[in-house]
Amino acid sequence: MAQGEKIIGIDLGTTNSVVAIMEGSEPKVIPNPEGNRLTPSVVAFTDKQETIVGEPARRQAVTNPKRTVYSAKRFMGRRHNEVQSEEKMVPYGITGGPGDYVKIQVGDSEYTPQEISAKVLRKLKESAESYLGHKVNKAVITVPAYFNDAQRQATKDAGQIAGLEVARIINEPTAAALAYGLDKKKDESIIVFDLGGGTFDVSVLEVADSGDEEQESRVFQVVSTSGDTHLGGDDFDEALINYVASEFQKDNGIDLRNDAMALQRLQEACEKAKKELSTLPETDINLPFITMDASGPKHLTMKITRSKFEELIDALVERCRGPVLQALKDAGMDPKDIDEVVLVGGSTRVPKVREVVKSIFGKDPHQGVNPDEVVAVGAAIQGSVLAGDRNDVLLLDVTPLTLGIETEGGVMTALVERNTTIPAEKKNVFSTAADNQTAVTVRVFQGERKMANANRLLAEFNLEDIPAAPRGVPQIEVKFDIDQNGILSVSAKELKTGKEANVEIKDSGALSDSDIEQMQKDAEANAEEDKRQFELVEARNKVNQQVYQLEKLMGENDDKLSDDDKAPMNAAIEKVKKAAEGDDLAEIKAASDELEAASQAFSKVLYEKTDAAGEAGADAAGAAGATAGGGDDDDAIDAEFEVKE
C-alpha cells in the first residue's frame, strides 16, 4: 500500500450510501461532489445513454421512472423467487427465471444488482480520491448482519467491479458498535438496533478492555445477531403509498399504481411525508395534475396524521420484536442485562419504532450517534486497523446463519452453528449411505430449518473415486472454512486415499471471476465518459434554470419592454436552448456565458426603463445577477424538481 494511502470505510445502503476515512484518531465523513454527506443509492440511465449516479439521478426519477434504479441492495445475491414482494415495489423491470439470480431490466439492457451498486461505490471512491488527493484502492464495506453468503459475495463483487479491493466485509451493527464504543472507558453490553431502508439487523455485543497491560485495546465481541432482510423504511413507504393510492382510487376510479410516472411522484411524496411525520403530528400530500381522464386533470390532496401512519405501519414495526428477542435469547440475556441500545439507520427516526424499542428494554435508546453516518464511521475505523494505523481495536464478529450439509433422508446436518465467531474452521466425518458407493455429492446449505431443502442451497460438488466398500465404512471428512468476511469455503476428503474435492462459495452471487473482470474493465473504460455525461447533465440543468429565471423576469416586466429590448435576450435564450439539446459540453458552456452577458445587458436596459429605478432596478439586477452567477446548483435543481412534482 502506498505511503499515506487510506483504506476507506463505505456503508453501501439501500437508500443512501456514505464514505468515511480516519484522519489520525478522528473520523471524517467525506462529502460527494454535490456537497452532501449522504449519497442516494440511485443510478439512472437516460434516453441519450447517459449514466447518472446519486442525487442527480434521484432528482430526475419522476420523469424517468423505468430507467431509474434504486434499492438495488434488496436484490443483491437474490434469486428471482426470493424477491416477489420486492419487485412489486419498484417501477423498473426484474428479470430471470424463478431459480435464477436477479437481473435488472433498463430499456434493452440488463444489469446485475452488483453492477448497479458498483456505480454507487465508484462515485464514493471518486469522492474519497478527490478529498484525499490520491488514488484509493482498498475499502471496508459493510453489509447487514443477516446477509447470507450469496449477498456477501455479491457485495464483494460490486466492490471489485468498482475498482476496489475489498479489504474486509463487516456487519453494519458491528461497525456501528465500533463507532459508538471506541472512546468509551467502561465495559458494557450493548445491542445495536439497525433499521435501514431495506433491511433490519440486531446484534448483541460485549465491549470491554482487553486487559493486556502491554497493549491496551478495546475488544468488540459480537455475542449474537438476528434480523430480517425483507424489512425496512421502503416497506413503511409502501404501506403509505398503498393507502393513499387506494383512497384516490375510491374517489376517482383510477389506480395510480398502474402509471409508472404517477407512482414515482407518489413514492417520493410518501417518503417525504414519512420523514415529516417523525417531527410533526400531521402533514399534507399535494400532487397537482397527478393523472387525468376524460373529464380532465386530477389532483391529489390528502392530509396524513401521525396516528394514521402509525396504524398503517404497526404490523411492520411489530416485526422488529422477534429478531430482538431472538438475539437476546441466543446471547443468554434478558432486556435488563443490556446497558445501552444504539439506534442505527434512518428508519429509527420514526417515533413508533422508538416506542417499540423502549417497550422492550424499559428505557430510552442511546441517541449520541448519527444513525445515517455511524456505520460508515465504524467501517473507517476498521479500515485504519487493517491499514496498520492503529492497533487498539480488536473486532470479533459472528456468522449470522447456520451452515451445514444435506445428509441421509434430506436432513440438514450443521457444521457451523449460527453466531459462531469468525474466522472459523469446523469439520466432521461422514460416510456413505449405500454399499459400494464410489462417489458422494456434497450439498451445502445455509439456514435454520431442520430439512435441508427448506434452507438456501449455496453450492454442491462431487467427491469421486471413493474405494468401494460396505456402507458406513469409508471415512469422508467435510471441512467448512469461513473467512473474516463471512464467506465460506468447503472441502471433502476421503481419509484412506487422501482424495479431495473443494469449492469456494463464489458462484452464490452468480458472477464468475471473468464476469467481474469484464465488468471492472467496462467500468474503468467508461469512467471518463460517465464523468463527461455527468458534467453534461449538470450543464443542462444550469442553463435550464437560467432560462427559467430570465423568461420569468421578462414576463414580469413585459409591459415595460419593446420587442427591440427583448430581441438580444430572446436570441441568447434560443441559442442556449438549442445547445442544451445537443451533447457538446463546450457549446453549452459557451452559450451559457453568452446568456449571462445578455442578462447583464438586459438588466441595464430594464433599470433605465423602470420608473421606480431603485426598487425595480435592484430586483432586476438581483435576479439577473443570481442567474449570471449560476446560483447554487443544488438549489436550482431542487426548485425545478418541486415544480415538476
From Swiss-Prot:
Function: Acts as a chaperone.
Region (Disordered), start-end ranges: 509-530, 615-645
Example of a GO biological process term: chaperone cofactor-dependent protein refolding
Keyword Ribonucleoprotein listed: no
Keywords of the record: ATP-binding, Chaperone, Nucleotide-binding, Phosphoprotein, Stress response
Biased composition (Acidic residues): 631-645
Lineage, top ranks: Bacteria, Pseudomonadati, Planctomycetota, Planctomycetia, Pirellulales
Coiled-coil ranges per UniProt: none
Gene Ontology MF terms in the entry: ATP binding; ATP hydrolysis activity; ATP-dependent protein folding chaperone; heat shock protein binding; protein folding chaperone; unfolded protein binding
Annotated SUPFAM superfamilies: Actin-like ATPase domain, Heat shock protein 70kD (HSP70), C-terminal subdomain, Heat shock protein 70kD (HSP70), peptide-binding domain
Low complexity composition bias: residue spans: 615-626
Top-rank lineage group of the source organism: Bacteria
Name this protein carries in UniProt: Chaperone protein DnaK
Stretches with biased composition (Basic and acidic residues): 518-530
Species annotation: Rhodopirellula baltica (strain DSM 10527 / NCIMB 13988 / SH1)
Family, similarity comment: Belongs to the heat shock protein 70 family.
Modified residues (Phosphothreonine): 199
Induction: By stress conditions e.g. heat shock.
